[in-house]
A protein has these predicted regions:
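Long, charged/polar, low-complexity intrinsically disordered N-terminal extensions
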Residues: 1-106, 600, 604-606
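Acidic, contiguous N-terminal accessory segments
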Residues: 6-8, 16-17, 25-26, 92, ...
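Long, folded non-catalytic interaction modules
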Residues: 43-73, 78-80, 88-90, 150-304
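Mixed-charge (acidic/basic) macromolecular-recognition segments
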Residues: 110-145, 226-349
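Structural motif
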Residues: 175-179, 391-395, 421-424, 443-445, ...
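A domain-level signal for caspase-like cysteine endopeptidase catalytic cores
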Residues: 283-439
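Catalytic cores of nucleophile-dependent amide-cleaving enzymes
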Residues: 439-524, 528
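Caspase-like cysteine protease fold
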Residues: 517-638
Length: 638
């Protein structure tokens, strides 16, 4: 993960291996003109007269209308701009100048090697040992709250003969009952504290012996909500105290405790966290993710992926969903198949994103499995071009083929190839799913035997592998087929739990594709898209739905616009992240992702906000693109 900060004078990319700064004094956001390689993870597109980079660069030797500069240090920054740009270098950096404001695309990537796996016994104590070792790699200071500065967590491997080091002298001790569920729930907090996590206590407790500090917790199930609130508070206070170049957050949470960033950063982590843990202050942040885990050793093996994302962990508890709750009713339109799944409603904790790492199909959470995380780790995805395929095996749903134009227009920040197929046979469709590519969008019918084709049905279980990183099976009752695609090699996808109307399927498909192309994750794109139809809960995500098919070039925000007489209320919503920030375009202040405020603007200001931003807008309950909405408002005299 690379941290991408928008600063007062440009941008700063921060990674595990270093940082690089781009400075420009006249940057204006704009739709991309020059394609970036698909290997970039984030960046920005806009226009300027001049920009400089504080790292050595190499130029693409191939003559072209587009110039490419790439830093020779890590993280790797890629600049693409027209041949009219004049480049000067001095060995330590480069400056690009234009006679008039000109389009520039900036992308950043970083290749970080995951550490060697940790081998531990397949037991609660073994898992606790792995969590303890993972916490040793964190920075000492409050900058551990900045996601890009947290090193990758080592994978876990099991060996019953592996030995544990019981001679632990870490300043912070976290003891829990000798049961896997308590270890899993405690893991995110113990990891973030850099604590020694051990088993054997009758009730959970954090102790800092040198300070004679002790904090007891209530046993499960209350333990889960208590650890969640504690971790939220620690990250919020660390975020207020950290000093990451290019970022400045409000330190009001510290001031409320009569602390300053200087006081906090000057002491050892154990002293800092004893102070924070003892504080009577509620968690003041919207959390990004919670995962509900069935306590088995096989699922515990995936804990490093959850710690990498700093997901909260809760016990997997759920109740059956009644047909009434799913808004099932007599529907006059015809259904496109009848392969239904009886879903569960999980008992959700805090968070915007919810993952279900347990048996059963669920609503309001994405169903993930160990295979999804294994697939994400094993895939290299180092191709410089996104490869997308749209398949329509239902002539009455051909309107979704128009998504090809959306993908072309909205993924043009990066190099993209798109294929369109209609009425594929079972063999042809199998080859589509098996070949390596970024994404497959399937429209058609799903029945008990599989996805319907002109010559029969294709069952995902018959595939040798699933080569698509992500997918959307926009067909009735496609849940089981989607689960199988993940088991066969995909990372995540969108599916349906039951029969859906053609019209609603098309509406969700168009919105989902539009948002996915804008750099949204599978989970967030589906969560927003399904709000557009009354039976949206019939759509679900499987696998690690935090995956994106396109780089997030910018914040990947959603503008929510509400008319208020002659004025408009605007919210610039950026999805929460584990300690990440964004720069509010209205105030210029850095805010934690997931925190936003409403700004009231007049017509002229609204148009200026919308123009030059290729981002989705929720306006009067419908999704639009900002530039298109600006043109409509202008034509209406608004």
């Amino acid at each position: 993960m690379v941290g991408w900060l928008s600063t007062e004078t440009g941008f700063r990319a921060i990674g595990q291996t270093g940082a690089v700064t781009v400075e420009t004094d006249d940057w204006e956001r704009a739709r991309p003109v020059h394609e970036l390689p698909a290997t970039v993870s984030t960046g920005a597109t806009g226009r300027c007269r001049r920009l400089s980079v504080n790292a050595p660069v190499a130029a693409d030797p191939e003559p072209s209308d587009t110039q490419t500069l790439t830093t020779t240090t890590s993280p790797t920054l890629t600049l693409r701009f027209s041949s009219a740009g004049a480049v000067t270098t001095d060995g330590d950096g480069a400056t690009v100048s234009f006679q008039t404001p000109s389009p520039v695309s900036i992308g950043v990537s970083e290749r970080v090697h995951r550490p060697e796996p940790l081998t531990v016994p397949p037991s609660p104590a073994g898992i606790a040992t792995a969590v303890t070792a993972a916490g040793d790699r964190l920075p000492d200071g409050p900058e551990r709250s900045f996601p890009a500065l947290r090193p990758a967590v080592p994978r876990i491997e099991f060996d019953a003969s592996a030995t544990r080091d019981d001679d632990d002298t870490r300043p912070i001790q976290f003891t829990v009952p000798d049961e896997l569920e308590s270890v899993l729930v405690a893991a995110p907090l113990a990891y973030y504290l850099g604590a020694s996590l051990t088993v054997g206590a009758s009730r959970p407790r954090i102790e800092i012996p040198a300070l004679e500090f002790s904090l007891p917790f209530t046993p499960l199930p209350a333990f889960a909500s208590e650890t969640a609130a504690t971790l939220q508070r620690l990250v919020a206070l660390d975020s207020a105290a950290r000093r990451v170049e290019g970022e400045r957050l409000d330190d009001a949470p510290l001031a409320a405790l009569e602390l300053t960033p200087d006081h906090v950063t000057a002491v050892e982590p154990s002293v800092r966290y004893a102070t924070f843990l003892d504080a009577d202050q509620p968690a003041a942040t919207t959390w990004h993710r919670s995962t509900y885990v069935e306590p088995t050793i096989e699922r515990a093996r995936i804990l490093p992926a959850l710690l990498d994302q700093l997901s909260l962990v809760y016990p997997a508890e759920a109740t059956a969903v009644s047909p009434q709750e799913l808004l099932e009713s007599a529907l006059e339109d015809f259904f496109r198949g009848v392969v239904s799944v009886t879903p569960l409603a999980p008992e959700l904790g805090v968070g915007v994103s919810h993952g279900w790492l347990a048996d059963g199909a669920v609503v309001d959470a994405f169903k993930t499995t160990p295979a999804a995380y294994d697939n994400a780790t094993e895939r290299t995805d180092d191709a410089e071009t996104l490869r997308l395929t749209i398949v329509s095996n239902d002539p009455e749903m051909d309107e979704e083929l128009a998504l090809a134009e959306t993908y072309r227009n909205r993924t043009n920040a990066v190099s993209t190839e798109i294929e369109i197929h209609e009425s594929l046979t079972t063999g042809e469709l199998a080859r589509v799913f098996e070949r390596p590519q970024t994404y497959v969008h399937y429209v058609g019918h799903c029945e008990e035997a599989g996805l319907r084709c002109p010559d029969g049905h294709l069952s995902a279980s018959s595939l040798s592998r699933s080569g698509a990183r992500a997918f959307f099976l926009n067909a009735c009752g496609s849940y089981r087929e989607g689960e199988t695609l993940v088991e066969k090699g995909s990372v995540a996808g969108a599916v349906t739990l039951d029969a859906v109307l053609n019209e609603q399927a098309a509406t969700v498909g168009q919105a989902f594709g539009t948002l996915l192309a804008a750099g949204y994750s599978v989970r967030r794109a589906l969560a927003l898209a399904r709000r557009r139809v009354p039976m949206g809960r019939d759509y679900a995500a499987v696998g690690d739905a935090t995956v994106r098919i396109t780089p997030s070039v910018g914040d990947a925000p959603l503008l929510v616009v509400e008319p208020r007489g002659d004025e408009f209320a605007i919210r610039y919503e950026v999805a929460p992240e584990s300690g990440g920030t964004y720069r509010d375009p209205f105030t210029g202040r850095h805010r934690r992702r997931g925190a936003w405020q409403t700004t009231v603007v007049d017509r002229a200001r609204l148009r200026s906000v919308l123009e030059g931003r290729g981002i989705p807008v929720e306006f009067d309950g419908s999704f639009r693109w900002s530039g298109e909405l600006a043109a409509d408002l202008r034509s209406q005299g608004l």
